[in-house]
Amino acid sequence: MKIVTIVGARPQFIKLAPVSKEIRRHFEEIIIHTGQHYDFEMDKIFFDELEIPTPNYNLNIGSGSHGFQTGEMLKKIEEILLKEKPDLVLVYGDTNSTIAGALAGSKLNIKIAHVEAGLRSFDRKMPEEINRVLTDHISNILFTPTETADINLKNEGINSGIFNVGDVMYDSLLNALKLIEKKNFKILDELNISKKKYILATVHRAENTDIKENLENIINAFIESNEKIIFPVHPRTRKYLEKYRLFEKIKNYDNLKLISPVGYLEMIYLENNAKKILTDSGGVQKEAYFLKVPCVTLRNNTEWVETVLDGWNILVGSNKEKILENISKFNPASETYNYRFGEGNSSVKIVEVLRNL
């Protein structure tokens, strides 16, 4: 069987790594990198760290409106599918690359498999939610991470092709922890910060960066907390920090340590050694949960509802008072932890399903 895998954003590379490794033991795989966020050279550290094969095709789409990105991807992916004639198109998550790949394949009557199917935030204002729903409804094989995802699909009338395989990001995280043992990261020494004596923060979503009031609230909460906060700054976040003149303000406060974005392994290292995590990233919420690190989510909803139900993740949006309150007071009890994301063998289960098609 020939499988075309479509990715374009860094969280997808993390999901791709264990699955691709398993796929290549049994099938032919062609990887398309859409370049939705960055070109391959910018993303090369992820491919190298995670030992992902070099993509067969790099589309270099770059940034742009949702319509522009999706349309350009759709055209170029269709050309490749017509040339490669795969038996299956495999897509991950909820990006524009996901929906473009699924649409291109389905219109050519190629089977679509969706990894991370069934997730719902129930907020149709989120572009990711639209991508998730549409992709699920045109996919033939739906690989879900949780029972909640299964229920979501069935509530929407999807009753066949659902396979609960657990979460592939847990596969990646377990592998990352093994690789980190062989590394000697110096970042905490360079920042003069001890393990479990800092909070790790990430901010990148449009609702938090593009709206000045929201970004100001978040940054002011970070400053006023007086906690040591390590803050890897996403390029779009940096752009808006500079635009709103918050970048200069931050430099006056020693508790807030701004650093450049880091690779996957170093990010897991920072997450694992943080006493708490502040984020608006879906992937980081989940990694925090896997690592049993309390997470304060700078959003009003989440697709990872299990992390909230277990009491290890709390949603605060961009409300400064709520952020400050939970920086100081949010400390989940270990007995509430009820892990339900699979056993770290999701990639094996996915390939077992594909082998039995």
Curated annotation (Swiss-Prot):
It is an enzyme of class 5 (isomerase). Disulfide bonds: none annotated. GO terms for molecular function: isomerase activity. It comes from the Archaea. Pfam families: Epimerase_2. The keyword Isomerase applies. Keywords: Isomerase. Its EC number is 5.1.-.-. Signal peptide: none annotated. PANTHER family: UDP-N-ACETYLGLUCOSAMINE 2-EPIMERASE. NCBIfam families: wecB. Belongs to the UDP-N-acetylglucosamine 2-epimerase family. This is UDP-N-acetylglucosamine 2-epimerase homolog. It comes from Methanococcus maripaludis (strain DSM 14266 / JCM 13030 / NBRC 101832 / S2 / LL). The lineage of its organism: Archaea, Methanobacteriati, Methanobacteriota, Methanomada group, Methanococci.
